[in-house]
Swiss-Prot record:
The modification Tele-methylhistidine is found at H74. The modification N-acetylcysteine is found at C2. It comes from the Eukaryota. PROSITE patterns: ACTINS_1, ACTINS_2, ACTINS_ACT_LIKE. This is Actin, cytoplasmic. It is found in: Cytoplasm, Cytoskeleton. It comes from Biomphalaria alexandrina. The modification Methionine (R)-sulfoxide is found at M45, M48. Actins are highly conserved proteins that are involved in various types of cell motility and are ubiquitously expressed in all eukaryotic cells.
Length: 376
C-alpha cells in the first residue's frame, strides 16, 4: 500500500494554528494560523492580483482590510468550505506537495461528532485524491510524543480543552472531559481586563495583538490571592509592551489574572470546573485500579499549557484533591506546543502502523463510514 520512500503528511488542524509537515521529522515544517480572510472593501487597484480569500499568515498580515474567520471552533470543524481552503493551502503553498502522492494523517478533537470524521475522510479522498489517510485523536498523539502509552493528557489549545485518560494506548471515552475554555477565551478575557485599565482593543485585528501580549507576558500564579497582594503593593510584577503604533502599555496583575481563568472559570462567567478539577474528575471516572498510573503520568499538551508556572500550580491543585499518599507527577515537555503533531509524526512513521491506513480502495468499497472501523 505505502511505498517506503513516500513520506506521509501529518496535519494537525487546531482551532488556532494548523501544524503540518512530514512523518519522521521532529517538528512541523509549516505552522500558520487557521484563518481564512475575506476583503472588507472593494479592490480598486486593477491588476494587483487581489484574491477573494486569503489563508494563514497572508490573511494575518493583511488583517487590517480583511474579515477574519476561524473555520474550526472549539476543536471541531464548523465551516467545510473554508476548511478545504486551509487544507489546499497546506498541501500546495506550505508543504508544496501533491496530496495524491502521499498518505495523510489528520488529527481530530476527542469526542468529535461521527459525521465530522466522515466528512474529513470524504474530502481527503474525493477532493484531494489521497492514496491513503487516517484520523487520530489529538490527545493520544500527545501521549505517544511523551513516550508513554498510559497516562492522562490535559490538552489545551486555542479552542477547547480536554482531559483524556489513556490506558495502554486506548482512550477511555467514558472518562473524557471537555471544557470549552481555552486560549481564545483567555485572549478575549485579557481584552476585557485591559479595557478596564483604559486600553481599547475591539477588532479581530486588535485581538491578535492581545494574543501576542498574552503569549509574551502572562503566567500562572502558584498562589493567586498572594500574587494579587504583591501586585497591589508593589510594581515588581509590572511589564511594558510596545504596540505596533509605538504606544507603550503597562500591564500588572492582568499578567496572571488572565490565565487564572483556567483554574477559576467563574472569572469568565462560566459555571465549569477548572482544569485541575476537570483532570481529577476524569481520573475519578476511570477504574480504581488504573488511577494510580494516571496520577503519576499527567501530561500537559497544547499551546495554552505554555504559561510559565502552570505545571507547579497543577501539581499543587491536584495534590490537594487526590488521596494523601498518592504520587502525583505532572509532565510538561518543553515541546508540548507541538506534541500532537510530533506524536502524529512518530505514529505515521512506525512500520507497525502501515497496515492501519485507510486506502483509497477501501474507501471506494465502503464509503466514508470506513473511518469508524479503522480509526479508533
Amino acid at each position: 500500500m505505502c511505498d517506503e520512500d513516500v513520506a506521509a503528511l501529518v496535519v494537525d488542524n487546531g482551532s488556532g494554528m494548523c501544524k503540518a509537515g512530514f512523518a519522521g521529522d521532529d517538528a512541523p515544517r509549516a505552522v500558520f494560523p487557521s484563518i481564512v480572510g475575506r476583503p472588507r472593501h472593494q479592490g480598486v487597484m486593477v491588476g494587483m492580483g487581489q484574491k477573494d480569500s486569503y489563508v494563514g499568515d497572508e490573511a494575518q498580515s493583511k488583517r487590517g482590510i480583511l474579515t477574519l474567520k476561524y473555520p474550526i471552533e472549539h476543536g471541531i470543524v464548523t465551516n467545510w468550505d473554508d476548511m478545504e481552503k486551509i487544507w489546499h493551502h497546506t498541501f500546495y503553498n506550505e508543504l508544496r506537495v501533491a496530496p495524491e502522492e502521499h498518505p495523510v494523517l489528520l488529527t481530530e478533537a476527542p469526542l468529535n461528532p461521527k459525521a465530522n470524521r466522515e466528512k474529513m475522510t470524504q474530502i481527503m479522498f474525493e477532493t484531494f485524491n489521497t492514496p491513503a489517510m487516517y484520523v487520530a485523536i489529538q490527545a493520544v498523539l500527545s501521549l505517544y510524543a511523551s513516550g508513554r502509552t498510559t497516562g492522562i493528557v490535559m490538552d489545551s489549545g486555542d479552542g477547547v480543552t480536554h482531559t483524556v485518560p489513556i490506558y495502554e494506548g486506548y482512550a477511555l471515552p467514558h472518562a473524557i472531559m471537555r471544557l470549552d475554555l481555552a486560549g481564545r477565551d483567555l485572549t478575549d478575557y485579557l481584552m476585557k481586563i485591559l479595557t478596564e485599565r483604559g486600553y481599547s482593543f475591539t477588532t479581530t485585528a486588535e485581538r491578535e495583538i492581545v494574543r501576542d501580549i498574552k503569549e509574551k507576558l502572562c503566567y500562572v500564579a502558584l498562589d493567586f490571592e498572594q500574587e494579587m497582594q504583591t501586585a497591589s503593593t508593589s510594581s515588581s510584577l509590572e511589564k511594558s509592551y510596545e504596540l505596533p503604533d509605538g504606544q507603550v502599555i503597562t500591564i500588572g496583575n492582568e499578567r496572571f489574572r488572565c490565565p487564572e481563568a483556567m483554574f477559576q472559570p467563574s472569572f469568565l462567567g462560566m459555571e465549569a470546573a477548572g482544569i485541575h478539577e476537570t483532570t481529577y474528575n476524569s481520573i475519578m471516572k476511570c477504574d480504581v485500579d488504573i488511577r494510580k498510573d494516571l496520577y503519576a503520568n499527567t501530561v500537559l499538551s497544547g499551546g495554552s499549557t505554555m504559561f510559565p508556572g502552570i505545571a507547579d500550580r497543577m501539581q499543587k491543585e491536584i495534590t490537594a484533591l487526590a488521596p494523601p499518599t498518592m504520587k502525583i507527577k505532572i509532565i510538561a515537555p518543553p515541546e508540548r506546543k507541538y506534541s500532537v503533531w510530533i506524536g502524529g509524526s512518530i505514529l505515521a512513521s512506525l512500520s507497525t502502523f502501515q497496515q492501519m491506513w485507510i486506502s483509497k480502495q477501501e474507501y471506494d468499497e465502503s464509503g466514508p463510514s470506513i473511518v469508524h472501523r479503522k480509526c479508533f
